Amino acid sequence: MPSYLLSEADNAELLLDRLQVASGVEARSLDDGDMTRLVYLFVARILKEQPALNKSRVLAIHVGPGNTRLMLFKKGRIVQYNSYRMGAYRVADAVEKMGSGSDNLLSDIKAHVNGIIEQIVGAYANEPIDEVIAIGHEIQPVATTLAKDEEPLMKADRKTLSRLAKQLSVSKEKQLAETYEVNVYATRPLLAGVVCNLEVAGKFGLSALHVPTGRCGERLLTGLAGSDFAAKRFVHEV
């Protein structure tokens, strides 16, 4: 279940209690602070491993289920952070309630997020962006299908991703589940997540996005390994 749905549910505590009883494992919902720290540690590790990116002004975008987080890094250090209610599931749910058909789905998603995209552009208007790193459960499996090797970070052409987005908008759920190796429920936000990233990158005039390959959750957790130094720097900088 997407964390934003759990955090906003009236019976969240009851659901967590039942999950704990059924599994025998203590469970809690990740809050915004938890996710922000995870994303920061992950991006900090990417920049450390990519010297060229580490010298640039990099905007990291994490399109989560309910919110989109943006972090601006200059020479490897975070200098600005913003969060917006523009998550992949949130957008997909809102557009679904509009009754969009496949013919209008892509344009309806763009229209729905346009206002928030303009807010993002305004927030970073005084900061020239050299590169974008896009992180998320939707953009990563989609972009990974374009990867030519097993590098942990790929550079995805925006025009190519835009063509994939058009395919996503007309594809059946079963086909999407098989292609991107996700369950059927997780296919619903795929298009919204990809579009959010493309719209942000496009507004800043970037022709490509750097995308970590593989599954987002696994990469976030493995990114914690050896991250003690980054964690201390996170506290200091943020």
Question: How does the language model describe each region?
Answer:
Residues 3-55, 72-74, 80-238:
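Helical "lid/coupling" subdomains associated with nucleotide-phosphate turnover
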Residues 60-64, 134-136:
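Short beta-strand segments
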Residues 66-69:
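Acidic, divalent-metal-coordinating active-site segment for phosphoryl/phosphodiester hydrolysis
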